[in-house]
Every structure is written in C-alpha cells, then in structure tokens.
Amino acid sequence: MVRGGKGVPAVQQAKYMALAGKMETEVVIKSDGDEILHMFGGKKAHHVPNMVSHHIQNVDLHEGEWGDHGSVKAWTCVVEGKVETYKERVSIDEENKTVHLTALEGTDCLEFYKSYNLIFQIIPKGETKVVKITIEYDKRNKDVPDPQKYLNYLINLFKDVDSKLVQA
C-alpha cells in the first residue's frame, strides 16, 4: 500500500487534500490598520453593526472580554442577501497585526465546512496598507464549493468598514 504523509494511505491523503483548501486576497485600506484589527479582533467589534448594518446586523460577546485573546463572539451577518450566524473564537497577534477567527458554530459555514478559519493581517505596502484575508477550510464533501461567496463578502465588508473609518 502506498503511504502519504503521516502514515495515511496516499489515496485517502489525496482525497483529504482535495477537500481542504485555502483562499487569499488583499484589500487596500486607507484607514489606520490598527483600527481595523480592533474592529474584528474584538476591542471595538460592538461598533461594527452601527457602521455597516447591511453586512453585520449584530455582534454579541459570549465568553471573555471584548478584545481578549480567546474570547468568543457571535455575529449575525448578511451574506448574499441571506442572514447567517457565525460564532468564533478570537486569537490576536498584536506584534504581527494578525487576527485569527476560528468558527465554532455557523448556519451555513459549518454546515458545508468541517473547519473554517479566517485570518486577517494588516501589511504595510509602500505608501499604503493592505488587509490580507485568508480563509482556511475543510469541505464536508467533494460537492461543496470553495467559499468564494465568503471571500467576496469579506472583501466588501473590509472596503465598507475602511470607508466609514476614513470618513469618521
């Protein structure tokens, strides 16, 4: 029997690799990158629904304190016109200006994906900054599409939040 990595049969490993994936993109921002991190890392997350209610209708703190590493928040979002809920655990790396959000519960995202992680990183690029958005996921089966709709949603969300922060 041909073995893949970690002693897993090569056929099973190839099947798993086809179900696991990663999507990345970058969004140029004009606002302060730290402000964006605080909006999604938690310290100011409760302000997001007031800024972009067409994307985020509500955010509740379920465990910990706003902005604490390991805190749990529940978001009510509007993705492609459909209301979805998403509960996440937050991991913050202030030094690398990175926020990791690990899905714990979700209406669609965990219905279709066994695991779903969002990573946002603020990266200086010359005169500007970008938010690097990464979605890491593991599909429940081969018929599940890549989470392109969520990537599109996040692109629009970050553009709109950035615009509101610049106007403030």
Go through the PLM ranges and name each one.
Residues 91, 100-156:
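Beta-strand/loop substructures that line and gate deep hydrophobic ligand-binding cavities in soluble
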Residues 47, 57-109:
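Glycine-rich portal/gate segments that line the openings of hydrophobic small-molecule binding cavities
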Residues 2-20, 148-168:
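C-terminal helix/juxtamembrane-tail motif
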Residues 22-24, 83-88, 112-119:
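Short, surface-exposed coil-to-beta transition loops
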Residues 2-68:
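Hydrophobic ligand-binding cavity/cleft-lining segments
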Residues 31-33, 94-96, 126:
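Residue-level signal for tight coil/turn positions that link beta-strands
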